[in-house]
Amino acid sequence: MKKIFTLVAAALCSMSMMAKEYTCPLVVNMMGTDMPVGDVKVNVDEQGEGKYTMSLLNFDMNGMMPVGNIVIKDVEATKCGNVTMLNAAKDILITAGDKKDAEGNAQEWMGPSLGNVNILLKGELKGDNFNAYLNIPLAGGIIVGVKLGKNCNEMGQLPNAGFEKFHEASYDNAKSQEPNGWHSFMSSTGSMAGMVSAAVHTYASSEVRENAAEDNKQCVKIVSTPVKAGTLVVASANGTITTGRLKAGSMTASSKDNCSFLDFSSTGVDANGDPFYAVLNNKPDAMKVWVKFKAGDGNKHPKATISALLTNGEYAQDPEDKKHAANIIGRANNSSIESKDEWQEITIPFTYDNKNEMPKAALVTMSTCAVPSGGSKSESNPDVLYVDDVEMVYNADVKKVTMDGEDITNKFDEAGELEIEGYNKNLDINNFQLEAIGAGAYVTKKITADSFNTYVSFTVTSNDLKNCVTRTITFKDYTTGIKNLETLTLPNGVKAIYNTAGQQVTDMQSGQVYIVKYTNGETKKMIKK
């Protein structure tokens, strides 16, 4: 009997670990306008084998539009350091809720009348917090954005990207202000760390640009410092911050032992308790940054630099080491930021070596000089780089649309609509292709019909799910027949996915082998990681 009770207790304990209820602030976004709804309960249940189920019951857009129960099963989970990222592109049926209206009467729920609804989900589990963003297509082509969690807007962005929060970093008796989530030489490692860690390179500054947002009160000020041997100035130490950790490992300034680096396996934390890495399970197209740079006295290389490496979470460093090149998925770099002593916004595009792999982390590094130890040696007039509002940019636009192999991109009107009469072929969703603008954009294709017409619609959704564009082809009085009446969501550039049995599928399961056909004509065999 005791053994039975022990087994029951263990089972109950296991169940409590697998299922968790979160109280999340809910914001509904319609046509670009945020509408706060209040707190709601969300269940996130671990299914096992790296899958979760997310349940948002009785979803009601602030009393204006009762939608119903949104339950998404088989949500893919990716462990990214101290965060579990959730991703899904699923066709689901939204069922009726059971919540009564204000008078205690049963409500009419919209969800069941929508049929299969293709929902895109990005979420994160971090400690006791859950954040998520969902795209839900409703009737009439309306796409509703659902924001869950107090930090939902920070998903897909760097931590403390506006540099509004700082903590005190220290080394021996030296102290400085480091932006939360960012790190200077004061928290560096390496055999030479003792020589550079006492220098103050970062400050919280109120030197924000004009016309900044009302809540933009601070930015980070990064300065170079002189390196001294006794009282003799022998070199310049570039002011540098990174989302990873700085390493001072060599007396030779240009050595790759002097670098920024990240590694999810690292358990170290900074003075604020944050890890020395930034989670980014997204595919941005560019990075926008506001900067103000002034070169100091004696600077013969008056160019500041900002770089970003998107990685798989394993060890990577900047400057790069060829031994770890396979861990890098994408790059962005600007090593020619001019000394203008005024605010300017720069946009740095990302390029991707591995277009099929989704990043897990971002190593972003900013320095007062693009040349190692190449800046000012002045103590009174050093190089100064102000940085504010780093933004990862996610594109959603249309590059090319084809129908039965014909390019019809320029035939759509300004609203993205195209009418066709007299079409007499069977409609096959695979004969309609759209090439999107957006490195990680999602392309959803759908064939629908009413009593009068048949429609082929495309929706391009940015990788962070916050922007989308549509194209719709209306076939007037179409009567020939429809093949493959369905909804299909695929990553940008993918034409179709097949399993080893030759069946077309809409998503891939970890560890399985697939044949992937691309819009550029290539076909590849791959294993889903």
Question: Model-predicted segments: where are they?
Answer:
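Predominantly extracellular/secreted and cell-surface proteins with exposed
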Residues: V37-G38, V42-I119
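Short, solvent-exposed loop/hinge segments that bridge or flank secondary-structure elements
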Residues: T23-Y52, D98-A102, N173-S197
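C-terminal outer-membrane/trafficking sorting elements
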Residues: M15, T479-K529
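Beta-rich interaction/scaffold domains
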Residues: N395-G481
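Extended, low-complexity, turn-rich repeat/linker tracts enriched in Gly/Pro/Ser/Thr and Asp/Glu
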Residues: N62-M64, F293-P302, E314-Q317
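Aromatic (Trp/Tyr/Phe) and Gly/Pro-enriched flexible surface segments
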Residues: G145, G149-P284, P302-N312, Q317-T347, ...
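Edge beta-strand at a domain terminus
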Residues: A19-T23, P36-D39, N69-G81, G127-L158, ...
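Bacterial Sec-dependent N-terminal signal peptides
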Residues: M1-T23, G502
